[in-house]
């Protein structure tokens, strides 16, 4: 440790003034803990296992990609990782627009009313179902994932309710 760290840090650690966390891994390339830049990976795409993953076209797919990112990060580090669900919020509106288009096409094909109140009610019902399924996917995936080092990912997932604008 003395070769890699300044002498005063080593001394403070040895005297118990500070604690140098994970000093046993310090010299290795592997690192501890990540604040995942989920927003960038979802909005601009990312590469997982040498495969380009484009920006998701729905909330559910964004949730699935999120769990894949968590699995990859967990398999290449030790320690925890953190992300916020607010980065998934823009995909709720993407799904809302996609579902609205589908509902209008279905109702038009069946000769049903395109009254905004009816269309909105159907859209919001389907959207609520997709959001529930997406979050359930994250939950199930995180609970059942096993990394290449034989551990379940250590994840902190923030769910601040006031973090995104109303309606997202």
Language model features: what each stretch is:
Residues 1-168:
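Catalytic alpha/beta active-site cores
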